[in-house]
Amino acid sequence: MMTATLIRFEQIGKNYAQQAAVTDFSLNVKRGEIFVLVGASGSGKTTIIRMINGLVKPTTGNIYFDGRKIETYNLRTLRFQIGYVLQQIALFPNMSVAQNVALIPSMKRTDKSKINRLVDQLLTDVNLEPHVYRNRMPDELSGGEKQRVGILRVFAAQPKVVLMDEPFSALDPISRTQLQKLVLTIHRKLRSTIIFVTHDMDEALKLGDRIGVMRSGSLLQVGTPQEIVQHPNDPFVRQLFEKSMSHDVYAVYLNKLDVLGYLQPMPDQYKGPELAQEQTVREAFTAFVSADQLAIRTKDHHLQLLTREKLYQFVSDYRNH
């Protein structure tokens, strides 16, 4: 029988040459959620996710994957169940787009017709038309297209969990936003479990179903974006969020208005514009030129109401922060 928890950390510690990298780390990661670990460089985030696929062994404590201790798995069997996305996604240059995406399913001897359908569906989902992109080689792709294909390759394997270690930190803001949307789109369709590592609280709030804040190898707080923002239990957690508020107010994603409580329940009867949580305050102001209210589609795919008054209040509060 499947349990709600896919990965469980029990009092994990990791030392390097008598120096503690991780201390007393305990956490349950639920099936089907995007769990984001956020913290500064050196806080232990990458060490934690490397323990999941056996690249790093804990000094103390136990890790359970799908109900079994990690150490009891054959390493190859374990890693076939785990996808890994790093900053630099390298496609095989002598393989077409379709061959790159189909790599792991082919290694698993999945039926070819099923693989072909999967490849076409995934390409379609990320706005890469199969008949145009299937047979293209990596050197015929733009940088953003290569990133999308690399991410599809990981999800095509249908792993039980996908580990994403600062995958977008080296990208320009436009590419970064596009790939964040891609992750949310794929997650909505496949309901994969994702553990995402970042140092950017904005990114954490945008992507995470739950967020874990780390500092100096310790887990300070775990909660939903709303819980982290509205009820920080540590000065460092509060400071981390406040730093994410220092940017151009018009470039703020609408999901931040959700986590801060500026959105309201939808009325029974609503006819008007709809924006996605990945859109910005600037886009909301543009939409308000012809409307008094907006529907905002949140990450869980529910609609919430944004009024003109609440948007003005947010901008005022933001500038006075």
Describe the residue ranges of each PLM region:
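Helix-to-loop junction immediately C-terminal to a conserved catalytic motif
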Residues: 53
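Conserved ABC transporter NBD signature motif
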Residues: 61-69, 78
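Conserved ABC ATPase "signature" region
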Residues: 113-132
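Conserved ABC ATPase signature
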Residues: 137-141, 145
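Conserved catalytic motifs of ABC-family nucleotide-binding domains
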Residues: 158
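Conserved ABC ATPase "signature" C-loop
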Residues: 216-217
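ABC ATPase "signature
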Residues: 222-223, 231
